């Protein structure tokens, strides 16, 4: 038997086998050909342009195996919450009659969004039909959400909900937003009224990003310093700051 501990820990060895397989699986997926509505609340319009144009990310900024595992954790957690809500008596639909995930497409298919689910009935004290969206967060992020509420703590998610509510005509009832603490499995829940002004701003933003990208126009950066934390974590920071604009 090989002694993997001679050069690396068993944990490192297992990760070195799993991570490349996850990365290969991810790279084999068909890339998006549209701008995702869930991203329109991002801090920088230029970053959205790079995403929409499918610009190659900077060297070393590809999704690591660890990040891909976190993504999968989020998907699996969503499935669990769906089951829990149904057990609790909510009538939650996640697919249409054809078995496709609920969503919308606009701007000739260049802007799309896919929702976690729609609540069409259930316990008293809630209004139906209502949009349902779920996230899985680490403890620090979850506690900030609990303290400051969605609009302040997670504006990108607030923008996502507003867009989904308007394009799926689910704006008459507050959306149910849930977030699971990945460390403690506590559930945060918030009823989010429709924000028409936010939905309009985000819709306009999507149109701007699509129009400018297809015209070859580079939109301004949202930040003036490459050391800003948003830039440090951007997958296209090197590409962005190598231009004079």
Where is each model-derived feature located?
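Metal-dependent nuclease catalytic regions and adjoining charged, substrate-binding loops involved
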Residues: 4-6, 144, 151-158, 163-245
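Alpha-helix initiation/capping motif
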Residues: 36, 64, 136-138, 154, ...
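Metal-dependent nuclease catalytic cores that hydrolyze phosphodiester bonds in DNA/RNA
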Residues: 1-131, 138-140
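Structured loops at beta-to-helix junctions and adjacent beta-edge loops in soluble globular domains
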Residues: 51-53, 135, 180, 237
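Conserved active-site beta-strand-loop modules that form the wall/rim of enzyme catalytic pockets
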Residues: 127-134, 172-177
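A generic secondary-structure micro-motif detector
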Residues: 71, 150-151
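Short acidic, glycine/tyrosine-flanked loop/strand segments centered on an H-E-D-like triad
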Residues: 135-148
């Amino acid at each position: 038997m090989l002694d993997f501990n001679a050069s690396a820990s068993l944990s490192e060895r297992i990760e070195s086998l799993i991570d490349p397989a996850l990365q290969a699986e991810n790279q084999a997926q068909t890339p998006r050909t549209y701008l995702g509505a869930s991203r329109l609340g991002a801090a920088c319009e230029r970053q959205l342009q790079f995403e929409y144009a499918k610009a190659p990310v900077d060297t070393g900024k590809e999704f690591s195996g660890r990040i891909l595992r976190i993504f999968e954790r989020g998907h699996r957690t969503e499935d669990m919450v769906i089951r829990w809500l149904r057990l609790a008596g909510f009538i939650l639909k996640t697919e249409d009659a054809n078995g496709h995930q609920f969503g919308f497409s606009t701007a000739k298919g260049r802007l799309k969004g896919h929702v976690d689910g729609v609540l069409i009935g259930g316990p008293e004290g809630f209004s139906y039909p209502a949009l349902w969206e779920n996230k899985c967060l680490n403890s620090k992020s979850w506690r900030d959400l609990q303290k400051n509420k969605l609009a302040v703590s997670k504006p990108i998610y607030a923008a996502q909900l507003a867009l989904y509510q308007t394009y799926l005509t689910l704006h008459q009832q507050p959306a149910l937003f849930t977030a699971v603490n990945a460390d403690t499995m506590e559930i945060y829940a918030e009823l989010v009224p429709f924000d028409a002004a936010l939905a309009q701003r985000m819709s306009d933003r999507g149109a701007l990003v699509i129009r400018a990208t297809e015209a070859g126009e580079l939109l301004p950066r949202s930040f003036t310093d490459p050391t800003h934390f948003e830039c440090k974590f951007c997958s296209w920071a090197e590409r962005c700051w190598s231009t004079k604009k």
